[in-house]
Amino acid sequence: MKRNAIARIIIWSLVAVLLASLLVVGISSSPSSFFTGDWSSGIIGVTYKNSARYNVGGGTVTDEFHSIKVNWTNGKINIEAYDGEDTVISETEVAEKENKLRWRVEDGVLKIQQMAAGMRFGLKQTPKKTLTVKIPSNVAEGLKAVTSDSVSAEVTITGISASDKIEIDTVSGGANLKNIKTEKLDIDTVSGSIKAAGEFTELESDSVSGDVTISTATPLKKLDCDSTSGNISLTIPKDSGFTLKADTVSGDISCGLPTVSESKNRRVCGNGSADFETDTVSGDLIITSAE
């Protein structure tokens, strides 16, 4: 009897340690880093600061803001400029209150979370939802920064200007940016293509299993672009000056701009002032000039 009691104590102690470990992982995780699919089992933790101060569900933003920060897990993210007067947030309709989006303006930043903060136990479905943020054109032209962090979501940004940066980070989903203006554009995706067109002077991108297609109307000052199992296509102004250092495995380099110096993995165009670095595996690098 005594041995059985000791055995039960040991077993339940191990169970308690395991549950405590899962709880710590859940608490320390954000929705963008902890979900791995449509269904999750065990303990799911969704945390962000001041969660009780967030608005529940979509709505109209009345407070002024200069930046946008989105944390989204599954579905689609659409951020776009429009001719209206108010910034409007909406999402695919969901029944459960805990699965409705949360948003608030804090220190000039419009923050959007996919769902309520808290712990979830057992088998849970992470809802695939489409987030739409419509911003008046006069506001969209004067933003400071736009950042989006997601796990399995397609990201589309249209007609947005951000003086500092636009930053997209997604694991399983592509990014499509149209008519954007920013100083720095930073896009990372593991399984998805990247498309970006507009005006920007600094570009960083990293793509695994997807093509990268970039078009900018302004000369780039810095480029750092990596692609695995995909091509990099870059369209830049014809008077661009840059020094290209390219590392490619099982791929070709094609440069449609006049070069003043050329070697196997290096090209110098114009005054060579901008720094271009690319790394491709099983993909081509194609540089063309805009008309």
Predicted region positions:
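Short, T/G/N/S-enriched strand-turn elements that build extracellular solenoid repeat scaffolds
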Residues: 56-60, 76-81, 99-102, 131-139, ...
